[in-house]
Structures are given as structure tokens and as C-alpha cells.
Amino acid sequence: MIRVDRGQVLAFYAVLLPVVLLPLAAYTVDAAFVSTQAAGLQAATAQAAEAAAQQVDVGAVRSRSVLIVDSLGARVMAAREMRDSEPGAIVDSVVVVGSRVTITTRETVGLPFNFLPAQAIVIHARASARLVGGYDSPSSR
């Protein structure tokens, strides 16, 4: 018996490689890149929320002995922290309610391979932090 379909496997791989495997590899690289950028944005947003929550309203502490966050100071600090750690990010909102600060950010990320119809993806992050009182004196007694 003589086989006439010799070389058919080579033709199969010649079609399979550019049609299936290369786009799959490009998608994998794009997904890993976006995931890394999203993790960086989340970390920067959390750091900005912590820094913003440390902006104490001194007037409220002095007049009413209440520990709350200064709204204006928190907004300025959040914008500064985000500008320093993630320059491409945009602060969508800084919400201050009493001693809690919630920051919402977004960033447009360009994809390394333009495999998908979208050339860029917008990622979002949200983080909250709370201002809490510490100890009264440095002594442990």
C-alpha cells in the first residue's frame, strides 16, 4: 500500500501556526501586560488612599476633639500621590466621609500587540482607607 498524503502534516502546521498559535501568543502577552498594569494601578490607588486618609482636620480636633479627614487636604494628597506613582492615571473621585477616604482611578493602557480590535483598554481601581486614633503616650505602661 502506497500513501499519497505524505507531507500533509507539514501543511497542517503551516496553516495552524499563523492562524491559531501566533494570535494566541499575542493575546497571552496582551493579557499579562494588562494584568500587570492593573495591579500597579491598584497598588498606587491604595497608597494614595492611605496618604489621603492621614490628612487630619486640625480644626475639628481642636474644637470638638473629633478625628476626621480634611477633605481638601485629602484630595490634594491623593492627586499628588497618584501623579508621583502612576503618572498616566486619572483620579476620578475622592470621597471623604468622616474618617474614611475612598479613591477611584482609571488609566488607559495601550496594548503591546494590536491583535484585538481595541488598541487600548481602560482599567479602573478603587481603594479605601480609614483614619484611626493611635495611642495616647509612647509608653507601654
Residue spans of the language-model regions?
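Short, functionally important structural connectors and interaction interfaces within domains
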Residues: A26, E107-T108
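Low-complexity, flexible helical/coil segments
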Residues: R6, A51, M82, E86-I90, ...
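Alpha-helical assembly-interface signal, strongest on the long, hydrophobic N-terminal helix that forms
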Residues: M1-L72
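Short secondary-structure transition/capping segments
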Residues: V4-Q8, S99-R106, G134-R141
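Short amphipathic secondary-structure patches
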Residues: A49-E107
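Generic secondary-structure boundary/loop-capping signal
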Residues: A31, T108-G110, A120
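Low-complexity, S/T/G/P-rich flexible repeat/linker segments used as non-globular hinges
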Residues: P112-R141
